[in-house]
Amino acid sequence: MKQYEAVIRVMEENGGYATLGFLNQNVLKIADCKWGTKTPFASIRRIVQDDRFFFKIRPGLWALKSHRGKLPSEVLPSKDEPKELQEEYSHTYFQGLLVEIGNVRKYQTFVPNQDKNRLYLGKKLSAIASINDIHRFSFDHVVAKAKTIDVIWFNERDMPASVFEVEHSTDLRNSLLKFVELQDFNSKFRIVADTARTKEFHARLSLDAFRPISNRVKFWTYEEVADLHSKTSALAAVEAKLEL
């Protein structure tokens, strides 16, 4: 079997689409395909860019051209879908990537109650987040604010190690205010958004209200999250092979 055929098979078995991270973890498991290269993950990345067979849906997510009209709405929304719903699908997708990254990195992952039933590539977010209820790590009013954050990674001491807000079009101020509530904890704060919002991010963060956290908040683009997801998955695949 040729390498591109192995990628096609994995996608077909997954419904005609897959994240690059999913491909990294599964393509090399196909026994009758030989990868005579020291950089198989780079080869997979190159293969999915072959527009004879594949097309890109969003950062980190690819599909088979043969399945274009068969994909679920949350994977590839039709142009007739309301803009709000398309934005919700995109928002949930990046939440899902962050949850999966956290899971691989051995964190406890949490998503808010209002998002648990949203679909991430055919699965509810609640099905991939590792904890259902937020840890009571502080006073009630602090936890109440934290439980609305898009994704939280909790460490082994049940404390919030990293918190993420995915922002497509809403005001970044709301997310930064949530981070302010957690300023007394040793947490990393991350805003995930389109690169076009970088200037807006820095403008908001420069306000006096956010001075206490200004050096702790970082901006991640959608592309950076997708890249982290694929590389984290590739590392996990190597570790599994070596039985680490």
What residues fall within each predicted segment?
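Active-site metal-binding core of divalent-cation-utilizing nuclease and nuclease-like domains
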Residues: 81-87, 103, 111-158, 231-240
